[in-house]
Amino acid sequence: LVSFISSLNILLFVPTLSFSHIAFNGNIADELIDRGHNVTIVLSSVDDTVKSNGTNRAEILRIDVGISNGLLTRSLWQNPGPYEDSSPLNPLILAKLLRVSSIFVKACTEIASNTPLIDYLNKKKFDVGIVEQYDYCGFGIFSTLGIPSTVWISATAVYRLQPEALGVNYPLSYVPELFAHVDDRMSLMGKLENVLVATVTEMVSTFYSSIEETKVFRRLGVLAKSETLKDVSRRSHSIVLNAMPIFDIPMPISSQIVHVGGITVNERSETQLNTDWLSIVNQPNDGFFLITFGAIAKTRDMPPSMSRSFNEAFAFFSNLTFIVKDEDVPKGMIERRGRNVVRTSWLPQMALMAHPKFRAIITHGGWSSILESIYAERPMILMPLFADHAKNSQVVRAKGVGVLIDKMRVTTTVLIDSIREITENTR
């Protein structure tokens, strides 16, 4: 028997926005490599604090795009910070989105005019280009290289402008915008909020990022005067989402939209826990909770009143253990605080979730943590902080697998009631 294998040369264009986005792109690269394809990843280094490449199996080209150290991190997570009002309707957030967009435009200008890089990539003769939803620059790079097929991906749930580029309309009357604090049963005021959030985010994406980056490629002669990067995005062959239709708000769909939710979730293995962790989780009590707010929001940055509310709520449930991700704990150390609180700078999260005494996670509504909780078959208490956390948390509440709390209204009583809801009601 003779078998024929057709290997494609595939280019992923990945700005280093955050670890979760890098991980999603890395998982896609690994899946493609497993199927015999040749994968190159161009990492546009917009954030120097993100050191991960997502994979060590693909060819990695990490490109310095002239962004000063820590600039994107400061722009994203300060003034206001993650524990403050982060609605896109907050003028400070709009200003922040515009600052971040200007960073991406600068990075795009640098990478598009990097002649040695473009010459090297041209020699690779790529068949497919893959780019994520938050930056149009990749479409310009693919046009520069003459890549015939493009795939538009999202490490989160779907961003409305993606399906709409392919002709699938998402009615704002019942489909929540990715950054909006509403579900599909919106009140009149909820619908108004949804429309306003959609207007603000689309303005930043289309009328700033897309237009400014389009100018970059027009100056280089890649795009005609009448053509925009948004036009190029409409020629995408498919959209790949890190989402699951069964765990989302009902919305229009297309055969061009592919769902791969859970691709970033590693298999559980209780044997991954060392003796120190086993001595903590195997205590003769009612189990343990995990508390983590992702890689960006630091526990130390919590307002004192919020931190005090958490500590008082933990003390109320003396027969539960609360394991808190705390960046101030020395690396590799596990510190016990009080009778039932453990703090550490790093959590073996999936291994802890696989343990039978794991009760629930208190977290920020990041999509990766939600998918891991679903995989572990455990409920959640979600306190959305920014970006897509709002919509993610609304989905969790709508599906009945978690409790949603408002970060602007956190009190000891709210936290106690939320924990009691999880421990006393089967989900």
Located regions from the model:
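Glycosyltransferase specificity loop/lid
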Residues: V2-G221, T228, F247, Q256-F288, ...
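Long, low-complexity segments enriched in small/aliphatic residues
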Residues: V232-I249
